């Protein structure tokens, strides 16, 4: 009955007079409405063909049939051959690689493939593979895969869980999930910062041994992929490789897969921040070689500043690295730079020390020269007195020479020599008179030789002729500091000034210096020959003291070099050594660090 007929019936029917009639009309109208609704439903189904509803019902039935007699606690083929789980990975990004923490973080797609015969279904047209949501994973068995060297992992859930399941009609399962994992990466920093690191991710079953699960790379050598957009601030991805291995533990043997990624460090940062500044600091330390050695504040300040700067640079570099016990390549470079800078500071210390020693030697030689000149003047005065001998053999007065009558054995005989050094006449006359009063009455008369008298002459005559020397010649000048040239001969400054071998107090006769015959020459020794040391006035004083101009060059040198020579040599030696070190350093370390892992799939060759 149509709607128009119902409207006509309602208009034609009189108003109900009893409740029974009202109920009857309500029932009829309800039946008419139900019939009309069924007609509308059949009309919609006829328009759409009715296939989608049938498909929905079939897929739901397939999914519902999986739960019938399915136990997700039991692996497929339990008691039979192990389940083969294929694995593929595709690295989306690598966010960090830390030397301090020894780990790296990467974001990747992780896919697993296995077969579960219990999930097989009859193939229908258009229904070869079922793509279902992540909730379905709770209803089936999945491998208990974990990452062996994982430190921290993150599962992405925005906007929904980043995971899907695909069930093939043959029972093969594909599970894909997106993960971000921080995994440990032990590093060898021996060649840092020219090192290459090989980091890996290890995949293994947590509970199933090889009798239950075996892992394999599902697509062979192409099972691991790395996006070409992967980049890091300090590293470049050189390539990757994959391995399959068996691990023996106390609980059994386990199948394990390893994906290894090799990184090569970029040198730009370390060249700009460490290598170039440290090299320039070494070059700056060489500036002190061109400064005047008397500019102590400038050279010391420059040396100390460069040393402290290198120390700060080394400390800041090692602060950003782990506390390792072996030597890194950057430690070799920085250590050498520090030694070069420190050596330049020690070079100035050496120059200053040598200059001080040479200055002290000059002052000492000037004092010796002054004393030698005074001695020479004394000898010249004595020789002049010898040129005009006194018949009485007694020369008094300042600078006079008195010869007493005493013989060689006389107790008081001798020659009184008074060389004027500001002494009064009473000294010369007094000593001469003393010699006469104590001389032997029958001693032969002594004469003084016309030959010039030196220190050696006087010393040899002492005791030979029974002479004694008094006066200013015995006013000795003694120094505790050893003269370098006399030191090698065992002499002191005192010996140098007083004639070398013999001192003024060597009164006893030596070998061959026996008493001469009476009346002999005043300077004669045994046999009347010339005494040791000669009669030259300059023989009493070494030539290098009487003629300082001849040894001026030696005075300005210490160990054969001068302080200026050290600066000149340093200007050449230091740069040459540093350049040679740099050549050897870069050639050796760049060669030994250029190591590529075997069977590595380079990033551009995928």
Curated annotation (Swiss-Prot):
Residues that carry a glycan: 58, 253
Here the disulfide bonds are 185-199
Keyword field: Cell membrane, Chloride, Chloride channel, Disulfide bond, Glycoprotein, Ion channel, Ion transport, Ligand-gated ion channel, Membrane, Postsynaptic cell membrane, Receptor, Signal, Synapse, Transmembrane, Transmembrane helix, Transport
Where in or outside the cell?
Postsynaptic cell membrane; Cell membrane
Transmembrane annotation, as ranges: 269-291, 297-316, 333-356, 569-590
Question: PROSITE patterns this protein is in?
Answer: NEUROTR_ION_CHANNEL
Give me the stretches of Gly residues compositional bias: 396-425, 499-536
Region described as Disordered: spans on this chain: 376-451, 482-542
Q: Name one Pfam family in it.
A: Neur_chan_memb
| Main location per the UniProt record | membrane
Task: Write down the InterPro entries for this protein, in alphabetical order.
Answer: GABAA/Glycine_rcpt (IPR006028), GABAAb_rcpt (IPR002289), Neur_chan_lig-bd (IPR006202), Neur_chan_lig-bd_sf (IPR036734), Neur_channel (IPR006201), Neuro-gated_channel_TM_sf (IPR036719), Neuro_actylchol_rec (IPR038050), Neurotrans-gated_channel_TM (IPR006029)
Q: Which residues lie on this side of the membrane: Extracellular?
A: 45-268
* Segment forming the signal sequence: 1-44
Q: What are the GO cellular component annotations?
A: chloride channel complex; postsynaptic membrane
Respond yes or no to whether keyword Cell cycle is given for this record: no
Give a GO molecular function annotation for the protein: neurotransmitter receptor activity
Give the Low complexity compositional bias ranges. 381-395
Record flagged with keyword Ion transport? yes
Q: What is the membrane topology listed in the Swiss-Prot or TrEMBL record?
A: Multi-pass membrane protein
Entry function:
GABA, an inhibitory neurotransmitter, mediates neuronal inhibition by binding to the GABA receptor and opening an integral chloride channel.
What family is it from? Belongs to the ligand-gated ion channel (TC 1.A.9) family. Gamma-aminobutyric acid receptor (TC 1.A.9.5) subfamily.
Q: What is the name of this protein?
A: Gamma-aminobutyric acid receptor subunit beta
Gene from which the chain derives? Rdl
